[in-house]
């Protein structure tokens, strides 16, 4: 492979799709051979020379390993940089992009382990994608909420509630001060709560809470289903009853289904919340799999207005600088290369709308100062047990979160250092809020 696919003197084109792989060769296999094999097996190569190679423009179409970089502190690990010509990929298809780059090469026996760390999506390719159905600014305009993080809550217990009791829990949280409530990722249409009943009771809760508070409210109605046709039916019903947002589990549902649903949401005025259920199966191993920053980039291309991104401070794993790196890749129009945050390539999204990060998992009011400092305003902070676990009930739990959030935002705007004074800010707010 290395005679054809390892090209250290290669000049990368501005239209090439670039990939950074963390590569662990098998003992005795040269790194150059492994890097070339990755480039070959994820583009035009196969295990032997075939006569039909002569019928193609192989030098133009092949992937090329153009650089190898030893991983500091590891004896047999390398970052292999691979450039793929843009013509290898179908326009507007995340499915085809991932099928080509990661679909086959991970089983290559010359490799002990392989992890896709990052992708550079050139403007020439990113412009073939619609991106998020609406984006952060349009969502803020629809909600008429600015200058603070949005607040949400996942309804618990996740399974077992009747539709009416579920709707009651939604109402209590929304009237208490939250902006959103959420279906858990595995709430679809089970025997104890069919989807249509849940949608109707949640819509009633939303409208009642909006009337009482004067604020726009929403509930992430999970439209994920066993078939795309059923998913469209649920999304269509949500649009008919006038709710603002629905939800999809994009990894278990699939990228093709997600892109189709995002297009439906764009055409029908629905925001789309994305849950990353199953992500840790793919991204948790440090030496093998796909890093979440790649899954976040591909989701932004496929389409999603919200995406769960980890918390840094809660119960789920996430390193602060690395998490902030892919949060920027979700929200910002242009992100510079920064290896300290795990960003291997400069990424220019060329005006594609941003996806709002959602921090969820084991967080509560004492985390509010850190979350406000880390994520800023353009984020949704989801407190499940941190709302429903309040000793006075759901509405007081929601009120406590809202008071804590607004106190932290005000303190930040006054120039106070939340990393040092966050505890004092919460204690001061407690004097004026018995719920907190």
From Swiss-Prot:
Catalytic reaction annotation: 2 (2R)-3-phosphoglycerate + 2 H(+) = D-ribulose 1,5-bisphosphate + CO2 + H2O; D-ribulose 1,5-bisphosphate + O2 = 2-phosphoglycolate + (2R)-3-phosphoglycerate + 2 H(+)
Subcellular location per the Swiss-Prot or TrEMBL entry: Plastid, Chloroplast
GO BP: any one term: photorespiration
Post-translational note: The disulfide bond which can form in the large chain dimeric partners within the hexadecamer appears to be associated with oxidative stress and protein turnover.
EC nos: 4.1.1.39
NCBIfam families the UniProt entry points to: PRK04208.1 (NF003252)
UniProt cross-references to HAMAP family, sorted A to Z: RuBisCO_L_type1 (MF_01338)
Subunit structure: Heterohexadecamer of 8 large chains and 8 small chains; disulfide-linked. The disulfide link is formed within the large subunit homodimers.
Entry similarity comment: Belongs to the RuBisCO large chain family. Type I subfamily.
Protein name: Ribulose bisphosphate carboxylase large chain
